[in-house]
Amino acid sequence: SSGSSDAFITKYDKNGNFVWARKFSGSDEIRGLRIAVDKLGNVYTTGSFEGTADFNPGFASNILTSSGNTDVFVSKLDSTGSYVWAKSFSGTGMSRGLGVEVDDQGNVYTTGFFQGNFDFDPMDW
């Protein structure tokens, strides 16, 4: 791992044969805690991270930086394991993403916890 721990996603076919694996790595700790797959095979994960983390498992990078505490992440990979997007949410204390679901329209829902104040829409300046 790059930091104290990295997160991974692996895909196997219905017969247990390996298809692909991807990792999220960073300067400190990344914990992948929940996964969901939509009807198109896109893969969504949530969990927590500290420090800086690269959520693009390909050749490019998408570096997210925590606010100094443990922050929430939500990410999306397509059915082939290619990066689509990743978001982070932070607050004044520790926070963690504990669940992720996708509805039939492709809307993504997350649940978790936070301490202190929390910014649910970091792009809303």
Write out the residue ranges for each language-model feature.
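A sequence-level/structural motif corresponding to short, flexible coil/turn segments enriched
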Residues: 1-125
